[in-house]
């Protein structure tokens, strides 16, 4: 059974990190619960931001707040269906485990540090949808930066 390690994406999450290489793909589109969560929120794939747009931060300037919120609700739905969130609360340990499993990251890996920093940055946010999108965006941005720095090395 395929685990939705969006887990980042972190983030959501988790799998989003490896998906960040394909910037034209929609965030979360490669996971089992994507279509279900779209349907539950009355959205289509066209309503969902691309990985490239989110990892670069363009989603914040190119879209209305309602679009941001709706995308976040789809992310939260997928995270919750995969047991990584309950409401607005993360299961941080499960998120780390799934992220490590998805990415192959080892202890001390900067990707794990980035995931931890993103969870810390968003942990006090109360709106579950906004929190989920900010988390996913944080992880994708960190993945993009780390990928760029390793390519430059």
UniProtKB/Swiss-Prot annotation:
Keywords: Behavior, Disulfide bond, Pheromone response, Pheromone-binding, Secreted, Signal, Transport. Residues 1-19 form the signal peptide. Pfam families: PBP_GOBP (PF01395). One of its GO terms (cellular component) is extracellular space. InterPro entries: PBP/GOBP (IPR006170), PBP_GOBP_sf (IPR036728), Pheromone-bd_protein_Gp-9 (IPR022354). It is found in: Secreted. Disulfide bonds join 37-77, 73-129, 118-138. The keyword Secreted applies. One of its GO terms (molecular function) is pheromone binding. GO terms for biological process: response to pheromone; social behavior. It comes from the Eukaryota. Colony queen number, a major feature of social organization, is associated with worker genotype for Gp-9. Colonies are headed by either a single reproductive queen (monogyne form) or multiple queens (polygyne form). Differences in worker Gp-9 genotypes between social forms may cause differences in workers' abilities to recognize queens and regulate their numbers. Belongs to the PBP/GOBP family. Homodimer. This is Pheromone-binding protein Gp-9. It comes from Solenopsis electra (Fire ant).
């Amino acid at each position: 059974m395929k685990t939705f390690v969006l887990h980042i994406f972190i983030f959501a999450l988790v799998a989003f990190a490896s998906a960040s290489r394909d910037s034209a793909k929609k965030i979360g589109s490669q996971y089992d619960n994507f279509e279900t969560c779209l349907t539950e929120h009355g959205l289509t794939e066209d309503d969902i931001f691309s990985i490239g747009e989110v990892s670069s931060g363009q989603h914040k300037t190119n879209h209305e707040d309602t679009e941001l919120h709706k995308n976040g609700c789809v992310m939260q739905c997928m995270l919750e269906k995969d047991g990584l969130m309950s409401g607005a609360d993360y299961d941080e340990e499960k998120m780390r485990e799934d992220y490590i499993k998805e990415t192959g990251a080892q202890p001390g890996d900067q990707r794990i540090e980035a995931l931890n920093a993103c969870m810390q940055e968003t942990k006090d946010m109360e709106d579950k949808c906004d929190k989920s999108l900010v988390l996913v965006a944080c992880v994708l941005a960190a993945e993009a930066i780390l990928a760029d720095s390793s390519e430059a090395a």
